[in-house]
Amino acid sequence: MKNQKYIRNFSIIAHIDHGKSTLADRLIEHCGGLQAREMRTQVLDSMDIEKERGITIKAQTVRLVYKAKDGNTYYLNLMDTPGHVDFAYEVSRSLAACEGSLLVVDSTQGVEAQTLANVYQAIEHDHEIVPVLNKIDLPASEPEQVKQQIEDIIGIDASEAVLISAKSGIGIDLVLEAIVNKLHPPKESSTDILKALLVDSWYDPYLGVVILVRIIDGTLRKNMRIKMMATNSVYTVENVGFFTPKKHISDVLYAGEIGFVTASIKQVADCKVGDTITDEKKPCEQALPGFKPNLPVVFCGLYPTDSSEFEHLKDSLAKLRLNDASFEYEMESSSALGVGFRCGFLGLLHLEIIQERLSREFDLDLITTAPSVVYKIHMRYGESLEIHNPADLPDLQKIESMEEPWIKATIMVPDEFLGAVLSLCTEKRGVQLDHSYIANRAKIVYKLPLNEIVYDFYDRLKSCSKGYASFEWQIDVYEPSELVKLGILVNGEVIDALSTIVHRSRAEQRGKVLCVRLKDLIPRQQIDIAIQASIGSRIIARETIKALRKDVLSKCYGGDISRKRKLLEKQKAGKKRMRQYGNIEIPQSAFIAALKIGDE
């Protein structure tokens, strides 16, 4: 298939729950990609978590063959991209593989913050955008208002927006005609030298790593020797083909096409999303622009509740890493929790997904330490460090300054909840950058410290707006900040698993809350237990769990007072010995509950 004018490469942009995967299902069904008996909901979402949460995590592609009204047969390559902000880099690479996008907006809800972020990325990639209004068969649908919203917020003409209901199949043929008539075909190949974009990759137990590619120039054939330009590794192509969504093997992929390649690659870490693939014998001179390594943003410790499960956890993480190169981990040990792993994630959703997959697919029961971010530390003697584990923070006397990451957040919220959202952002040390109104919704842009977001910001935003606010963010800058290490001591011993790095203005409040929480959770012992929060050597909060007292005089009825005194002195000496050598056992439930702390 060398004639590029009959190829259309497109992606679908939508907020969570606006009907992206349902529309993809209908397009596959309409073009006969699957028989009716093989159809199921969310065909392209392969993981159970993707189906349950209604989100797309890995990019998927499918080739549809469509006989248009003009009598020609078109080959439509649909790229189903992740919609969540944690996977923004995957989205940008998927968009780079396409020439156009369908912007799917729920006609009962209007434009949301995440839609905005992805649309702006598509516009940066010079995409032709076709607005599609979904759920028009619902009574609450307001297509005219939503069209106006699209024009006001995004600034693209929505007068010819396609009105559909993906669930009931209304208007699907109109979407296909719009793809054929409004989206551009791929640019003509300027050279015969292979240049292909690596869009995504995943691990197959039989084939090794399967790579999703978009051919920009040249052709990709079976048995070719290919080179990855970012890692300089070389492989021999075993199979090339495409998905319909079933796997189809073909001998060659031409310029403009999207397909898959297998080449006995052992791990996904060798295939970096956004890399350029070229011919080893005749390499292209310049790699495709936009490649950057995916760096973790949020870190936390994962520990097995039962130490005998450590090897199982180690194997499970290695298996997950096969399929998810953006997830990093290294071994660490804690005096309170034993041996575990320090893991790095792209964001909070990514962290939740990995946790959920570990408990579901590998049946692991885990303790997760408080999430932290990467801080930049400038020492007095000139050295600079990057740390993400509070336990690694050097002595404050040796530190010249500390920097923390700030994000730029866009929040869309209905008018009536604006006050609550603004006060939440202010409480989280936010700085307002922009504030505008579109119909009865407000769009606010805030600069916020990432440290404040990773705790409970998203949950609190949803609860203070009754679920109506939508939120999107990207890392902005690192700025100097007055940060301190908040340590928790139980009977004078530091519990490293509960240490966190916080802003000085929040330390006292968070320390008090943690001490009160632990007081309720740690069981009483035979001696008093002191729970303290400290900054360096200064104690900023304290709670005491009173001792249980055994009544040693219960068997003494009357008689000599010296007998009673002797028993009491014996008890006193025993308690003194316990205080000296006694170890306070902190139950796992106390750790789990204390680590769920927000800023109550």
UniProtKB/Swiss-Prot annotation:
GO terms for molecular function: GTP binding; GTPase activity; guanosine tetraphosphate binding; ribosome binding; translation elongation factor activity. InterPro entries: EF-4, EFG_III/V, EFG_V-like, EFTu-like_2, G_TR_CS, LepA_C_sf, LepA_CTD, LepA_IV. This is Elongation factor 4. Required for accurate and efficient protein synthesis under certain stress conditions. May act as a fidelity factor of the translation reaction, by catalyzing a one-codon backward translocation of tRNAs on improperly translocated ribosomes. Back-translocation proceeds from a post-translocation (POST) complex to a pre-translocation (PRE) complex, thus giving elongation factor G a second chance to translocate the tRNAs correctly. Binds to ribosomes in a GTP-dependent manner. GTP binds at residues 17-22, 134-137. GO terms for biological process: positive regulation of translation. It comes from Rickettsia akari (strain Hartford). It comes from the Bacteria. Pfam families: EFG_C (PF00679), GTP_EFTU (PF00009), GTP_EFTU_D2 (PF03144), LepA_C (PF06421). Belongs to the TRAFAC class translation factor GTPase superfamily. Classic translation factor GTPase family. LepA subfamily. Its main location: membrane. Residues 5-187 form the tr-type G domain. The keyword Transmembrane helix does not apply. It is an enzyme of class 3 (hydrolase). It is found in: Cell inner membrane. It catalyses: GTP + H2O = GDP + phosphate + H(+). It is a peripheral membrane protein. One of its GO terms (cellular component) is plasma membrane. The gene is lepA. Keywords: Cell inner membrane, Cell membrane, GTP-binding, Hydrolase, Membrane, Nucleotide-binding, Protein biosynthesis. SUPFAM superfamilies: EF-G C-terminal domain-like, P-loop containing nucleoside triphosphate hydrolases.
